[in-house]
Design a protein with these regions (language model features):
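Catalytic cores of carbohydrate-active enzymes across secretory and cytosolic contexts
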Residues: 1-533
Length: 533
């Protein structure tokens, strides 16, 4: 084990527990699962992040039926004070960062930078996760990255590999180059070349518009140049400065988070000269966190999965009643859909043929549970949330929306629903880990062939596919027709009339997902394919 490289895993967010609110969504949950898995496997890895005092957003539905955001101040008594502080120069002023350590969620050490100390003029830089304005965002990324590298050195933690989870940690690469030029006397080209040997990079967003770009004037003003020149920074990130292009040019190897995403990412970044090779390492989830122990025992003992699932479903329905004061029926086919509110995820696709969905809902054949948050400054996403909420008013006995989506809601739904619906516009879903969590609990996936599902789906055996991988302008009509066809001809008849087949499919789903889509498999691939040279 001593021969394994020592890894520092940098990420803007970490989802370790619902009460530790330093995460926004899937990126953070992935990062949290990876730290827990490293602990399980005794791998030499540490996490580097930020202690967000206000977290992401507490998003509730107002009286007008629209989501509204609030930002409570959180304090945590379970963190260890390392006694270490470091400085990062931002906008010409030194910002002091305190370093906290978190190990209390069965995870390897996670070091968190915090500017909320009396010595700082701007203690709020580590207030809200994902700053609203470019200046704030760049400052936060500098704290994570430049501050993270300096924190590890101050803590005397040896690092062989720096893993950038998404492009936010890119300034860490610039800091490593600066160090080599200043302390070791290297020229820029040699320092860059040596730095690349230390960095690996995970790219997530398969949509150009979702990849962060900054104006050079802003970066210079903020201090992200960090001793480098405009010419040197342009060689790394181009002009304007693309954070993803920079990640690809700063790393020795990069990965996409699924096989289909790998194809998409290679096409997207084919014109980036000097980019690292992009391989595919499909995401996975932490079994111990997401797979209910009772369903695992029933699966392992070859006992009645139906009975155990019904128990989990009842627990979910009771939680829904406690939150929403609505009694859903335990014997009705229940479909769950919970994820970030983004247009490409098409949470409303199932409502595209109202004459059919109304018959199914009012006829007692179907009930729907939705949950999800929109980015606070994403008006389109907020409209999606409002539209979903409005459907609960149209069908108050059959549709539920659970507000303020978090890890706890995610656990409840991916254990208690009968079917997990996923219908993004292909190929815009890089991975999508909620379906993996559902699959591990015998909740059957009904999904477009996007993200992870093309790798796991055996139609009619462990879940169902929507369509045949169609990509084109007419995707809305094509996919909605396919969704209804599978729902009416296969999903509903199997649930009500072929109960033994349903249980067999549940067993196949658990068998398919429990290792293939586990974070253990993922992390071992990171070591074998990325970390070990």
């Amino acid at each position: 084990m001593d021969k394994l490289p020592k890894v520092a895993y940098f990420c803007m967010e970490f989802g370790l527990h619902e009460d530790f609110k330093i995460y926004a969504g899937g990126l953070g949950i992935l990062a949290g699962d990876l730290l827990k898995t490293a602990k399980d496997c005794k791998f030499p890895l540490v996490g580097v992040g930020i202690l967000w005092r206000q977290g992401y957003t507490k998003q509730l539905i107002g009286k007008n039926g629209k989501p509204c955001d609030c930002y409570p101040e959180y304090s945590y008594d379970f963190l260890e004070d390392t006694g270490v502080t470091i400085n990062v120069r931002i906008r010409g002023r030194q910002v002091k960062c305190k370093i906290w350590k978190c190990t209390c969620f069965n995870n390897v050490s996670l070091y968190l930078l915090d500017t909320n100390i009396p010595e700082n003029n701007e203690p709020c830089l580590t207030g809200q996760l994902y700053g609203w304005f470019p200046e704030e965002r760049v400052a936060q990324e500098m704290i994570l990255s430049i501050g993270g590298v300096r924190a590890l050195k101050a803590l005397k933690i040896d690092v062989d590999v720096y893993h950038f989870n998404d492009s936010h940690p890119v300034p860490a690469g610039i800091e490593l180059i600066r160090e080599k030029m200043k302390k070791d006397g290297m020229n820029f080209k040699d320092a860059w070349k040596e730095t690349r040997k230390q960095i690996v990079f995970t790219t997530h967003t398969p949509v150009i518009e979702g990849n962060e770009v900054h104006d050079h004037k802003l970066l210079k003003y903020m201090g992200m140049y960090n001793g480098l020149t405009y010419n040197q920074m342009s060689q790394i990130g181009g002009d304007p400065f693309s954070m993803t292009a920079a990640g690809l040019r700063l790393s020795r190897k990069a990965n996409a988070v699924g096989k289909l995403h790998g194809v998409t990412a290679k096409k997207m970044w084919a014109n980036i000269q000097g980019a690292s090779e992009i391989i595919s390492i499909t995401n996975g989830v932490h079994n111990g966190t997401w797979q209910d122990k009772r369903i695992l025992k029933a699966y392992s003992d070859k006992s009645d999965l139906r009975e155990t699932h019904l128990l989990l479903k009842k627990e979910m329905l009771e939680e829904i009643y406690n939150r929403n004061n609505i009694r859903l029926k335990e014997n009705t086919l229940t479909i769950g859909f919970a994820r970030r509110a983004a247009p490409y995820k098409r949470s409303d696709l199932i409502f595209k043929r109202p004459e059919i969905i109304e018959l199914l809902l009012k006829g007692g054949k179907l009930q729907l549970i939705f949950s999800g948050k929109a980015y606070p400054n994403d008006l389109t996403g907020k409209k999606i949330v409002a539209n979903l909420y409005s459907m609960t008013k149209l069908y108050p006995k059959n549709i539920v929306f659970l507000q303020d989506y978090d890890i706890k809601i995610g656990k409840i739904l991916t254990r208690g629903c009968d079917v997990w619906l996923n219908n993004p516009i292909r190929p815009m879903e890089a991975s999508g880990t909620s379906g993996m969590k559902a699959a591990m609990n015998g909740v059957l996936n009904l999904s477009v062939l996007d993200g992870w599902w093309p790798e796991g789906c055996k139609h009619g055996v462990n879940g169902w596919q929507i369509g045949n991988g169609y990509e084109g302008e007419d995707h809305e009509r094509n996919d909605s027709e396919s969704l209804y066809k599978v729902l009416l001809e296969e999903v509903i008849p199997t649930y009500y009339d072929k109960k033994d087949k349903w249980v067999s499919m549940m067993r196949s789903s658990i068998e398919m997902s429990s290792f293939q889509f586990s974070a253990e498999r993922m992390l071992k691939e990171y070591y074998n394919l990325m970390y070990i040279q």
